């Protein structure tokens, strides 16, 4: 198999984000901020650092804010410069580097992740490509997709980012089956979408990162609706495995499930602790709360238990 340069990243962003209502009623869930950047910007930055230059967003209704975010805003930049806020103006300009191109494709119906990836085919063409699910925020020294691109170039086949999950949670993920000793890179021999714990082939879950060969498109075109009445990417990958090797890669880094409210809050706290300017004051705030033996009380009157002591982490740039 010819190992081409991976120039394209696909971002399926058509989902409605109902778990975050009413916050996502008029704003895309991918625009939810983690400290001072939206989830989709973290996703794009990871793809760019992995070598992507063409960014394909598969969108749906109420997603215009994503397009606006990555568009230039000369008026805002001019205003910031006139107010002496040159650093902020530079941050606005750097949201999307000039070498990157954005393509927006509308998913006509909510038919699942496999269908969303298939919608990107005209923009991807006959090249390998990355798929990034912005819900899964991964904090890593080397960006997760960059790690996976290296595995693709080493092995020459599609690569799925995986991690072990509690056996009781296999019905939330696509689960892979590998054979032999547990290693960082393993050939996949089976994959199933959201199996019940009693029948799951393992607890090794696919978590929002893919490097795929273009052959996946021909298989997605042939499959019907699977679990949940959707066209499942896992079903397409299962067919792809009949003709090409597909690999599971246990990535280095910590994943936050920002598709859940708890995971989103955990990401916000840890990224805030690691922020170059906010980290110190925020850490002191949490320590003061713990010293007082209480956590802040929400407006509903419900109080949470004292926070666990935050662990030191590498500093993140502002």
Regions found by a protein language model. Name each.
Residues 8, 53-55, 101, 128, ...:
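Residues at the starts of beta-strands that form the adenosine-phosphate
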Residues 2-82, 143-147:
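N-terminal glycine-rich phosphate-binding loop and ensuing alpha1 helix
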Residues 15, 61, 136, 143, ...:
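Alpha-helix/helix-capping structural signal
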Residues 262-318:
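Hydrophobic helical membrane-anchoring modules
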Residues 130, 149-153, 180-284:
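Catalytic-core segments of class I nucleotidyltransferases/pyrophosphorylases
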Residues 76-79, 86-178, 212-214, 221-223:
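Conserved beta-loop-beta/alpha segment of the NTase-like Rossmann-fold superfamily
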């Amino acid at each position: 198999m010819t190992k081409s340069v991976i120039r394209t990243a696909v971002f399926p962003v058509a989902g409605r984000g109902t778990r975050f209502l009413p916050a996502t009623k008029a704003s895309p869930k991918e625009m939810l901020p983690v400290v001072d950047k939206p989830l989709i910007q973290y996703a794009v930055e990871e793809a760019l650092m992995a070598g992507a230059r063409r960014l394909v967003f598969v969108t749906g209704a109420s997603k215009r804010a994503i397009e606006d975010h990555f568009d230039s805003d000369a008026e805002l930049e001019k205003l910031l410069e006139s107010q002496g806020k040159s650093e902020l103006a530079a941050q606005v300009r750097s949201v999307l580097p000039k070498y990157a191109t954005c393509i927006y494709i509308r998913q006509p119906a909510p038919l699942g992740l496999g269908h969303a990836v298939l919608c990107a085919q005209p923009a991807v063409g006959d090249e390998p490509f990355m798929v990034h699910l912005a819900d899964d925020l991964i904090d890593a020294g080397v960006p997760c997709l960059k790690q996976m691109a290296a595995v693709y170039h080493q092995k020459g086949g599609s690569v799925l980012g995986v991690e072990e999950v509690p056996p009781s949670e296999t019905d939330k993920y696509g689960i892979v089956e590998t054979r032999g000793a547990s290693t960082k890179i393993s050939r996949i021999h089976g994959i199933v979408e959201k199996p019940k714990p009693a029948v799951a082939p393992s607890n090794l879950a696919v978590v929002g990162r893919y490097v795929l060969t273009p052959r996946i498109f021909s298989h997605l075109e042939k499959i019907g609706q699977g679990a949940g009445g959707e066209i499942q990417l896992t079903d397409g990958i299962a067919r792809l495995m009949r003709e090409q090797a597909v690999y599971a890669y246990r990535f280095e880094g910590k994943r936050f499930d920002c598709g859940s409210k708890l995971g989103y809050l955990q990401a916000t706290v840890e990224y805030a602790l690691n922020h170059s300017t906010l980290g110190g004051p925020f850490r002191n705030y949490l320590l003061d709360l713990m010293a007082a033996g209480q956590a802040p009380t929400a407006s509903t009157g419900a109080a949470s238990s004292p926070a666990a002591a935050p662990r030191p982490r590498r500093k993140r740039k502002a």
